[in-house]
Structures are given as C-alpha cells and as structure tokens.
Amino acid sequence: MATTLGFKDIVDVPKWRMEAPALAASGAGMALAWDNRNSDVSGNPYIYLLRSASALDYFDPTTGEWGALATPGLAGTFGAGATAVFHPSQGPRGTLAAGGTTTSVVLSTALPAPVGVNQLANRGDGTGFRILVANKVTGKCEIRTIVGNTAGTTPTVYIDSAVPFTAAPNASDLYEIRAGRVFMLSAGTLAAGVWKYYDIATNSYSGNLATTNLPATIGSDSNAVALSESYVSNDRKPNEGFVSGGATWDAGSGAISKNCIQATAASSTTLTGSGMPASLQANEYRNFQVRIVEDTTTPTAVGQRSRIASHTGGATGVFTVAAFGVTPSAVAKFVVENDDDKILLRSSSSTSVFCYNITANTWDVTTFSAAGAACGAGVVVEQAFGPVRDVIGNHRHSFIYNFRGGGSASIDVLDIAGGANGSWSADIAYANKSQTFGTGTCGSYAPATFDGRFIHLNINGTQRMARFDVRNRRLDAGAYLRFPQGTALVGQKMAVTTFIDGATKLDFVYHLTNSQTQMLSMIVSR
C-alpha cells in the first residue's frame, strides 16, 4: 500500500521522540555519519557514530537500536577536533576475472578483507549492496543489486536473475561495490593513524591514510563534506548527475533506466553535450566531474571520470576536462556529477579548506582557496545539492555553506565552481540573522524532501533547534527539544535518514544529546 502524507501546519507540529540510548554518553569530538543518497535502492540504512579512537558504533533506524563495531584503532588524542563523514559512492573497486555470466561476476582485484557467504547480499535492511560493472567490450556501465556471494577476498558475486547484465562481463572489466565508507579523523598532535576509513561492504578498516598538510594539532572543532557522485538534486536519481540530457543509460531488462547526456563530439580533453538545459550557465559545474557511462563505439573508454576545468553554457555546452586515458568517441554518453574523489574538511580554527584526494591518498590546501575567516567551535559544513536546479542561477549545487562557529552568526559560502580554486562569499546576508553559533552547534542536511532546502541545526548544545533554507537563505526556528541537554560539547551530533516509499519521501532528523546517551528523532513534517 502506498504511503500518503497529509501533514497540516499547526495541527502537526514536529516533535522529538526517544530512541534507544547510545552505548556511551557523548563526548567532545564524537561524530555521527550517514548516507544522504535520496534512494532506497542505493542508500545505506545505518547511522554511524565515531565514539572514540577505539569505538565505532552503528544505529539502525528501522529497529531504533545500536550495535558496536570492531575498534578503528585511531591514533592521536581523541576529543575536540575529531570528526567523521560518510562517502556513499566509495567502496571496493578493481577488475574482474574470467568466468562471469549475465547473472554473476568473479572478482580479480581482491577485496580489502574476506567476506562471508552472502555477506554482500544484505546491507542491513535485507537488500544487497549495489555493484557497478563497466564492460570494456560492450562499452556499457550497468548497476545491479547483489543477491549472493561466495566467501573470501575474490568471491563470485551474484545478481538478481530478473535483472541480468545485457552481456556477460569479461576479464579485466571494472567493478565498483558502491556500499560506502566512513572516513574518520582523530584529534590531538598529528600522527600516523589519525585518518582512516571503515569499509562497510567488508566490515574492515583501512591502514593509516596520509596526513601530510593536515593541521599540526587537530583541535577546536571539525566538520567535513564528501563530494559524492551519488549526491544529486531531489528530482534526479543517483548516477544521473546534476545536468539533464536527452539520452538514457543502463536500460537493460528490468533495470532502473538513468538519464544522461549524449555527446556529439569528443577529444582527449573535451566533450560536447546535447539536449542539456538551454539555461545551463558557463562554468556552473566547473570543478565537478564528467563520467563516461556508455560508449559502444570506443568501449574501453567507458567508466572513466575526469575533472571539469571549464565549460560553456547552453544546450550544447562544451566541457573541457583533464585528459582521458582513452579518448571517448563522439557518441559517448556521460553524466555531470560531484568530483567523487574529494572530501573537504574545515578544522582546527583554520581558514584553510583541507582537501583529501581519495585515489592519490593526499591532502592539500590549494585545490580550493582559503576562507576569509577562520572556523571555530560549532562549525557546520554542508553542500546544498538537493534543490532542483535553479535556472536563474541564484542557487547553485556548487554552494557549500560554512556556519563559521566561534560565537559568530556568520555563514560563509564556498562556491566550488566560482573559479579555478573556487570562490568565497563571506558573511552572507540571510533572513533572521542574529543567532550566534558556538560550542555544541551541529547540523545535518536533508536533501530529499521539501526540495532539499533545509540544514537542520542544534543551537549551541541547548534545547533550541533551527533550520536554514539553503535556497532562500533564511534561518527559522526548529522543533524545540523537550528534553534537557547536558554540558555542551563540540562534535557532529545530528544526522538524517530518509523514508522512501515510491514517490513518497520523508526525512527523519536525529540528535544525540550533549554529554548524555539520549538519541532522539523527529519527522520533518514541515
């Protein structure tokens, strides 16, 4: 039976409800991390809590209960400055071995840890993880749901026979298990092991990731945003990108067909699109990426990603990109998405934008220019990717809102497409500007409902809540928390999950109270 919502203002005032208590009281630097994909097909159901250097927990919104995971073994002195962020389109990647069929693949590149029988067929809600295969013979990318697997590090992975691949995969074709990873940052003096990830598909941790160019001492407060290619506006599906086109990809029997852009010309560094919005503005998606999702003329080009250096506007815009390893054909199909290889971090009372390059495993402070003012305790960073594309251009998917914190009412906006290194709008004007944000302030972005307009905020670790409209730049009062808070602490203590039933979507906001174990949730009914 379809879910029908009929919330009425004033009658249906949003209210907080109790969930199961966390496994320990919240402390400084604790951080919730969650999947913001607007899809029940792709999304991970859990909310993760980095509780300490030795504790990572998960919360299951479908049961309202917590569970503990193995220790991440982070280095440093866990506390103020620690944080975590979920990157939904990361996960094990590599090549396939021979022996694939239209309903199975055999991995060649080993998983980071062995999996048990059928472990990949249940992500936590009874649905399997999604696997993308880039077939270098047919030139097609296809995404399917895993329904079974053998054990080990190079298992045979089975997909639903009702939704087969259009052709059997081949040896050396590419695979990506798009289960997501939780990236975790500890605090204190910089040391090897303060930055790691948890790989969800294999229930394993990375080794020590690079830390060069991070602050010498990680402290004060931190917040990060993952530029996932799976994050799209609320009117589009993951893997369709932000820019509509006149073509489709992955349209096999029973598959979920996806919109894309049809190229009309290509070189090693350019792609000319067609059927795009006439209102597309020049460089609106600079510093995003193009991804080749189908190329039946040059099949070895499929699956490639390339960062956009610039592009012209209009329905037939030309994208200038970093050189492809294999030049796509003039009839390739592509999508325009976030640069999936990036995580952006604000931290430690710095003006820098710390940029983590996932493939290279490097940090830099030069990809994006520094802010005009340092962040402080209560910093909140969110990319406003959810609203339907604004044809006027007043709102852009390239906007990253930075609540400065440190006792300031200032919100700074980084436009990652605003120049070769982005551009900043400092201390923007917004309606109802007065409230200051300090220790205890935290937030979570809800991109799937109400046109993806709202960042939900807990104010300074108190019982007061607010929400910020990213499209219309307005701060409004949120639903009051009728439960006393403990001592305010820095850390990411807000999260979002989305209930999806067909076309019906409903966001739930979660809050872990300060210096306490209480977890509460609220239906976003308005």
What are these regions (language model features)?
Residues V11-M18, Q90-T95, L174-F183, G254-T264, ...:
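Short domain-boundary/entry signatures in modular proteins, especially
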Residues A488-R526:
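Blade-level signature of beta-propeller repeat domains, shared across WD40, Kelch, NHL, RCC1
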Residues P45-L50, G180-A187, S233, E240-F242, ...:
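Short beta-strand elements that form the blades of beta-propeller/WD-repeat-like
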Residues N36, L50-S54, V133-T138, L185-A191, ...:
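Short, flexible beta-strand-to-coil junctions
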Residues A2-A28, A55-G91, A192-D221, V225-L227, ...:
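Trp- and S/T/G-rich repeat-edge/linker motifs of beta-rich repeat architectures
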Residues L69-F78, S89-A171, R178, N208-P215, ...:
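Autoprocessing Asn-cyclization modules and mimics
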Residues A28-G43, T83-Q90, N223-I256, V381-H395, ...:
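Structural signature of eukaryotic scaffold interfaces centered on beta-propeller domains
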Residues A31-W34, G43-L49, G126-A134, F183-M184, ...:
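Short hydrophobic/aromatic-rich beta-strand motifs
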